Protein backbone atom coordinates (compact mmCIF):
# COMPACT_ATOMS: atom_id res chain seq x y z
CA UNK A 1 0.00 0.00 0.00
CA UNK A 2 1.33 3.42 -0.96
CA UNK A 3 -0.25 6.60 0.42
CA UNK A 4 0.60 10.27 0.07
CA UNK A 5 -0.10 12.74 2.86
CA UNK A 6 -0.79 16.00 1.03
CA UNK A 7 0.49 16.98 -2.40
CA UNK A 8 1.96 20.41 -1.74
CA UNK A 9 4.45 20.43 -4.58
CA UNK A 10 3.47 20.42 -8.23
CA UNK A 11 2.14 17.27 -9.81
CA UNK A 12 5.25 17.11 -12.00
CA UNK A 13 7.59 17.27 -8.99
CA UNK A 14 5.44 14.74 -7.13
CA UNK A 15 5.75 12.31 -10.04
CA UNK A 16 9.52 12.93 -10.20
CA UNK A 17 9.79 12.20 -6.48
CA UNK A 18 7.78 9.01 -6.84
CA UNK A 19 9.95 7.94 -9.77
CA UNK A 20 13.01 8.47 -7.59
CA UNK A 21 11.52 5.89 -5.23
CA UNK A 22 10.82 3.47 -8.07
CA UNK A 23 7.10 4.28 -8.07
CA UNK A 24 4.63 5.97 -10.39
CA UNK A 25 1.36 7.76 -9.71
CA UNK A 26 -0.40 4.51 -10.61
CA UNK A 27 1.16 2.91 -7.52
CA UNK A 28 -0.51 5.39 -5.15
CA UNK A 29 -3.58 3.98 -3.39
CA UNK A 30 -4.77 7.22 -1.82
CA UNK A 31 -3.99 10.85 -1.06
CA UNK A 32 -4.76 11.98 2.49
CA UNK A 33 -5.23 15.73 2.73
CA UNK A 34 -4.57 17.45 6.06
CA UNK A 35 -6.11 20.79 5.01
CA UNK A 36 -6.77 22.98 2.01
CA UNK A 37 -3.89 25.47 2.11
CA UNK A 38 -2.04 25.70 -1.20
CA UNK A 39 1.24 24.36 0.20
CA UNK A 40 -0.63 21.11 0.88
CA UNK A 41 -2.68 20.74 -2.33
CA UNK A 42 -0.73 22.36 -5.21
CA UNK A 43 -0.30 19.08 -7.08
CA UNK A 44 -3.67 17.58 -6.22
CA UNK A 45 -5.47 18.44 -9.45
CA UNK A 46 -2.76 16.96 -11.66
CA UNK A 47 -2.45 13.78 -9.57
CA UNK A 48 -6.23 13.26 -9.60
CA UNK A 49 -6.68 13.87 -13.31
CA UNK A 50 -3.61 11.96 -14.47
CA UNK A 51 -3.86 8.95 -12.16
CA UNK A 52 -7.42 8.88 -10.76
CA UNK A 53 -6.14 8.56 -7.20
CA UNK A 54 -8.79 8.57 -4.44
CA UNK A 55 -8.58 11.58 -2.10
CA UNK A 56 -9.50 11.51 1.59
CA UNK A 57 -10.23 14.55 3.72
CA UNK A 58 -12.69 15.99 6.19
CA UNK A 59 -15.93 17.52 4.96
CA UNK A 60 -14.62 21.03 5.64
CA UNK A 61 -11.37 20.37 3.83
CA UNK A 62 -13.01 18.83 0.77
CA UNK A 63 -15.54 21.67 0.57
CA UNK A 64 -12.72 24.21 0.73
CA UNK A 65 -10.71 22.34 -1.93
CA UNK A 66 -13.67 22.46 -4.31
CA UNK A 67 -13.61 26.25 -4.04
CA UNK A 68 -9.95 26.49 -5.13
CA UNK A 69 -10.04 27.56 -8.76
CA UNK A 70 -6.43 26.90 -9.77
CA UNK A 71 -6.66 23.12 -9.28
CA UNK A 72 -8.69 22.67 -12.46
CA UNK A 73 -11.56 20.23 -12.96
CA UNK A 74 -11.75 17.59 -10.22
CA UNK A 75 -13.76 14.37 -10.41
CA UNK A 76 -16.11 14.41 -7.40
CA UNK A 77 -16.19 10.60 -7.34
CA UNK A 78 -12.52 10.55 -6.24
CA UNK A 79 -13.26 12.44 -3.01
CA UNK A 80 -14.08 10.58 0.20
CA UNK A 81 -15.14 12.33 3.41
CA UNK A 82 -13.47 11.15 6.60
CA UNK A 83 -13.95 12.28 10.21
CA UNK A 84 -11.47 13.01 12.94
CA UNK A 85 -11.12 10.14 15.41
CA UNK A 86 -12.97 7.72 13.12
CA UNK A 87 -10.62 5.02 11.86
CA UNK A 88 -10.83 3.71 8.33
CA UNK A 89 -8.83 1.13 6.42
CA UNK A 90 -7.03 1.64 3.12
CA UNK A 91 -6.01 -1.80 1.93
CA UNK A 92 -3.81 -3.03 4.81
CA UNK A 93 -3.24 0.27 6.63
CA UNK A 94 -5.51 1.57 9.39
CA UNK A 95 -5.79 5.36 9.18
CA UNK A 96 -6.95 7.40 12.16
CA UNK A 97 -7.31 11.15 11.58
CA UNK A 98 -7.02 13.48 14.57
CA UNK A 99 -8.17 17.08 15.06
CA UNK A 100 -5.53 19.79 15.07
CA UNK A 101 -5.58 23.53 15.68
CA UNK A 102 -4.82 25.41 12.46
CA UNK A 103 -6.43 28.23 10.48
CA UNK A 104 -8.13 25.99 7.94
CA UNK A 105 -11.66 24.68 7.40
CA UNK A 106 -11.37 21.35 9.26
CA UNK A 107 -7.71 20.32 9.52
CA UNK A 108 -6.42 16.96 10.71
CA UNK A 109 -3.19 15.08 11.31
CA UNK A 110 -2.96 11.39 10.48
CA UNK A 111 -2.05 8.33 12.53
CA UNK A 112 -1.31 5.04 10.79
CA UNK A 113 -1.13 1.44 11.91
CA UNK A 114 0.34 -1.40 9.89
CA UNK A 115 1.60 -4.77 11.07
CA UNK A 116 1.56 -3.75 14.71
CA UNK A 117 3.59 -0.58 14.04
CA UNK A 118 2.28 2.96 14.44
CA UNK A 119 3.32 6.27 12.97
CA UNK A 120 1.87 9.76 12.75
CA UNK A 121 2.22 12.79 10.51
CA UNK A 122 1.38 15.93 12.50
CA UNK A 123 2.13 19.24 10.80
CA UNK A 124 0.57 22.69 10.87
CA UNK A 125 -0.30 22.61 14.56
CA UNK A 126 -0.99 25.98 16.14
CA UNK A 127 -0.89 24.55 19.65
CA UNK A 128 -1.02 21.20 21.32
CA UNK A 129 -3.14 20.04 24.24
CA UNK A 130 -3.75 16.84 26.20
CA UNK A 131 -5.81 15.45 23.32
CA UNK A 132 -2.79 15.89 21.04
CA UNK A 133 -0.44 14.26 23.55
CA UNK A 134 -2.77 11.29 24.09
CA UNK A 135 -3.38 10.92 20.35
CA UNK A 136 0.33 10.81 19.54
CA UNK A 137 1.52 8.60 22.39
CA UNK A 138 2.95 5.16 21.64
CA UNK A 139 4.02 5.92 18.07
CA UNK A 140 6.94 4.02 16.56
CA UNK A 141 7.63 6.91 14.16
CA UNK A 142 6.52 10.53 14.21
CA UNK A 143 6.82 13.34 11.70
CA UNK A 144 6.21 16.46 13.79
CA UNK A 145 6.22 20.11 12.81
CA UNK A 146 8.95 22.36 14.21
CA UNK A 147 8.22 25.51 12.23
CA UNK A 148 10.15 28.48 13.56
CA UNK A 149 12.38 30.11 16.12
CA UNK A 150 10.19 32.73 17.82
CA UNK A 151 12.91 35.39 18.04
CA UNK A 152 14.01 34.92 14.43
CA UNK A 153 10.40 35.14 13.28
CA UNK A 154 9.76 38.32 15.26
CA UNK A 155 12.79 40.17 13.84
CA UNK A 156 12.52 38.63 10.38
CA UNK A 157 11.14 40.14 7.16
CA UNK A 158 7.56 38.80 7.30
CA UNK A 159 4.79 41.38 7.60
CA UNK A 160 3.26 41.83 11.07
CA UNK A 161 -0.04 40.11 10.21
CA UNK A 162 1.78 37.00 9.00
CA UNK A 163 3.97 36.86 12.10
CA UNK A 164 0.84 37.05 14.26
CA UNK A 165 -0.83 34.31 12.23
CA UNK A 166 2.17 31.98 12.54
CA UNK A 167 2.51 32.66 16.28
CA UNK A 168 -1.21 32.26 17.00
CA UNK A 169 -3.05 29.25 18.40
CA UNK A 170 -4.19 28.36 14.89
CA UNK A 171 -0.82 28.93 13.25
CA UNK A 172 2.32 26.80 13.56
CA UNK A 173 4.29 25.17 16.37
CA UNK A 174 7.50 26.93 17.25
CA UNK A 175 10.67 24.88 17.57
CA UNK A 176 10.44 25.28 21.35
CA UNK A 177 6.82 24.09 21.60
CA UNK A 178 7.55 21.22 19.25
CA UNK A 179 10.43 20.19 21.51
CA UNK A 180 8.19 20.34 24.58
CA UNK A 181 5.57 18.19 22.86
CA UNK A 182 8.19 15.73 21.68
CA UNK A 183 9.60 15.45 25.22
CA UNK A 184 6.16 14.27 26.36
CA UNK A 185 5.98 11.69 23.57
CA UNK A 186 9.46 10.20 23.75
CA UNK A 187 9.81 6.53 24.62
CA UNK A 188 12.39 3.85 23.89
CA UNK A 189 10.74 2.67 20.65
CA UNK A 190 10.16 6.07 19.02
Model-derived regions: residue spans:
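Cap/insert and terminal regions of metallo-dependent hydrolase folds
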Residues: 130-190
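Conserved beta-strand hairpin/beta-sheet module of binuclear metal-dependent hydrolase folds
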Residues: 1-21, 108-124, 141
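Short, conserved loop/helix-junction motifs that constitute active-site signature segments
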Residues: 23-26, 47-51, 73, 135-138, ...
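Metallo-beta-lactamase
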Residues: 59-109, 113-116
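Active-site metal-binding motif and surrounding structural segment of the metallo-beta-lactamase
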Residues: 11-57
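Active-site glycine- and acidic-residue-rich loops that bind
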Residues: 121-133
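Active-site neighborhood of phospho(di)ester-bond hydrolases with catalytic His/Asp-centered motifs
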Residues: 5-8, 29-36, 55-59, 120-123, ...
Amino acid sequence: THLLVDVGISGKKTVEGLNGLGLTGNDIDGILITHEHSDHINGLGVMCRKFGIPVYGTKGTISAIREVSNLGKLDDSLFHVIRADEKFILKDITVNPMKISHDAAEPVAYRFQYGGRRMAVATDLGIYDEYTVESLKCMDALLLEANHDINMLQVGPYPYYLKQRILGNRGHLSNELSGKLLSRLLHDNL
